[in-house]
A protein has these predicted regions:
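Non-cytosolic membrane-interface motifs at loop->transmembrane helix junctions
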Residues: 126-135
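Bulky hydrophobic segments
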Residues: 1-125, 144-155
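C-terminal or internal capping secondary-structure element at the end of a domain, subdomain, or sheet
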Residues: 138-143
C-alpha cells in the first residue's frame, strides 16, 4: 500500500492490514480456484470428459430453468461474484493507479481469465467457464464500488 494513498485517503485501513488481507485473499483464491490439480497417471480419464463452457450466459440460463440444477447454478454464480468482491476492494488500496472503476474491473477480468486458462492447462476437478469470468468481473466491480463508498464515508 502506497503511503501517498493512505495520506490522501485518511479513512483507508492501515497498510499492514491491507497487505495481510491481500496475502490471505490471494492464498484463498488460489486454493478455491486452482486446486486440486491432478498429476496422476489417470489424467487422461479427466481429459476425455473435460469440455470448457465457452458460450456466455447460455449455460446459466439453461441450468436456472432446470429445477434439479437451479440451486447449484445460482449458488455457483453468486459464489463467483462474492469471490472477487475482496479483489475489487483491495486493488485500489494496494495499487494507487487502479483508482478508477474501469482499471480495477479490467484487472479483475484479466485475473479471472488467467485463472480459467490455468484450469484449462492443468485439469483437475475444475473446468474453464466463461460465465465464471463474467461473474468474477461483476464481483470486482461490486468490490470497487464498496471501496468507494466505505473509504469516502469514513473520511
Amino acid at each position: 500500500v502506497s503511503r501517498s494513498r493512505l495520506a490522501r485517503e485518511p479513512s483507508a485501513p492501515p497498510a499492514w492490514a491491507v497487505r495481510s488481507a491481500a496475502v490471505l485473499y490471494a492464498a484463498a483464491l488460489f486454493v478455491i480456484t486452482v486446486l486440486p490439480i491432478r498429476w496422476r497417471a489417470d489424467l487422461g480419464r479427466y481429459r476425455n470428459n473435460w469440455r470448457p463452457q465457452l458460450v456466455p450466459v447460455w449455460n446459466l440460463a439453461v441450468n436456472l430453468r432446470d429445477g434439479d440444477r437451479r440451486l447449484a447454478t445460482l449458488a455457483g454464480a453468486v459464489g463467483n461474484v462474492v469471490l472477487f468482491v475482496p479483489l475489487g476492494f483491495l486493488l485500489p488500496l494496494l495499487v494507487p493507479r487502479l483508482d478508477r472503476l474501469w482499471r480495477t474491473v479490467g484487472a479483475g477480468f484479466a485475473l479471472s481469465a488467467a485463472i480459467e486458462l490455468s484450469q484449462a492447462a492443468f485439469p483437475g476437478i475444475r473446468r474453464p467457464d466463461v460465465n465464471d469470468v463474467l461473474m468474477n468481473t461483476l464481483g470486482t466491480a461490486v468490490g470497487f464500488l464498496a471501496y468507494r463508498l466505505l473509504v469516502r464515508v469514513r473520511a
